[in-house]
Regions:
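Serine-dependent carboxylesterase/thioesterase catalytic core
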Residues: 1-91, 164-174, 181-183
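C-terminal catalytic-base region of ester-bond hydrolases, centering on the histidine
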Residues: 69-184
Length: 184
């Protein structure tokens, strides 16, 4: 019995995984989970149009906590075309879904299906897509129980588009900052 092949990639690993799709036959990879992928949306879209890409299901995990890194990526890595944007803001392809892990509606939906992920506690983090409590358990469910997590259901129930860039950084703090607290 042949086991399904899945890919989990973080940051630039997503670009490597997507670049490999052109060399693979249809059906070679079942699910790809991209954790705050450092890749242009246009390049991801093109990779998902290859024979292997068309048969894979792509989960674009993002968070506005990664905004600074996406901004730097767009300034330091040559874009495929003028105005190209990093994939963290989402992109529309039939076999892909974007999940924003700093979106309360997304976290509520996932929790309702049994994947409880902690709310973000940082404004800037390139690693929260796998260090935040609950994320690794969710990815395990995506890969080991795909029937419980159909891509089409996620596409239909998750907010799209994701929040605008810098929305997390510019958000007012939910707790008073220590320097502004009254002392006795």
């Amino acid at each position: 019995m042949q086991r399904p092949i899945h890919i989990i990639a973080h940051s630039l690993g997503t670009a490597v995984a997507l670049d490999a799709m052109v060399h693979l036959p249809a059906g070679a990879v079942q699910r790809i989970i991209s954790l705050t992928g450092a890749c242009y949306a246009a390049e991801a879209r093109a990779a998902l149009q290859t024979p292997a890409g068309k048969t894979a299901q792509f989960f674009n995990i993002s968070s506005r906590e990664n905004d600074l890194f996406e901004f730097l990526f767009e300034r330091l890595v040559r874009p495929p075309s003028r105005g190209a944007r990093a994939m963290g803001r989402g992109f529309d392809v039939e076999n892909a879904v974007s999940l924003s892990l700093d979106c309360p509606e997304t976290l509520d939906f996932l929790a309702g299906k049994g994947a409880v992920i902690d709310a973000p506690d940082r404004r800037i983090s390139h690693w929260s897509s796998y260090t935040r409590p609950g994320t690794l358990g969710f990815y395990n469910q995506l890969l080991r129980r795909p029937a419980d997590w159909p891509l089409e259901q996620l596409r239909a129930n998750l907010p799209h588009p994701v929040a605008e860039r810098w929305s997390r950084i510019l958000e007012r703090p939910s707790v008073p900052l220590p320097s502004f607290q009254k002392t006795a």
